Amino acid sequence: MAWLAGERWKLKAFADFDAGHGVDLYKATYARTFQVDPADVTKKQRQIGKVMELGLGYQGGVGAFVNFARVYGIDLEGEFLHAVRNTADPSDLRAGEEAFEWQSAQPDYVADLSPDAWAACYAVRTAWRRAHPAITEFWAALGRAVTAALSPTHRAGMMHRAGDHVLVTAYPHGDDLRDVLIRLPSGRSMLYPGARPAYASERALMIFEDCEYSATPTRTYSGKLCENVTQAVARDILVGTMQSIEDRGYKIVLSVHDELITECPDAPEYSHGELSRLMATAPEWAKGLPLAAAGFEAMRYRKD
């Protein structure tokens, strides 16, 4: 996602860590978000940084952050609240308090956090977005491109750019709907069939009215499209390495998320180091994308 959006400080953080002279990403994220020295980031603050990375990257808000925080055992009413109050911008906390007043007045609001903890989560969300201007702009660029593709002025074949690597177009689908295609940097496209612009009351970017995979209309938004694009690009990179891996004599027997499990002769010319190098080879269309891989050798599949 950082590469797609052009978030240069984060790309440098990845590259520095891979080169062995940088802090890990969760510390770097916490430090950048709250403008503190990475060396001063505590173990508990690093855990907050991890939840920020996992929960906020695809336009997640307070709800997404809370869900991930609970998965990773963060006490939002205790140590988290103390850590945020000590490092967050006071104006972000005040904005969080004001946002809570509005949110808590909504008929569908469920009170599962204290006002102070909710405001602290909102402050984290605000600070993370401010620390990632290129990523937040990429969300907006995807939204603008899709909106343009669904607009009355769009004509079949017109391309709308979202950042430096992604193009969006659309083709008619019946009388009122369109098939939206998002072209990835690899040249492959993702299809969103039977789409229309969302109404303001639907709180979405576009709606799929005619989709064989769902009996009811499905809504999506810019952050979710960012997730779709990011995961699709990751897939293209992984699949793109498979042929060279097979050609080198590593028989691929299974893939699990971002892992490849291979079988090969128990001989010195085969190693997990070489396999990692092959997996971390960027394709021609992904110049400037930092890649790293690690692995191990075993007689059966297991987690490292």
Each model region followed by its residue ranges:
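Conserved catalytic core of nucleotide polymerization and phosphodiester-bond processing enzymes
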Residues: 1-304
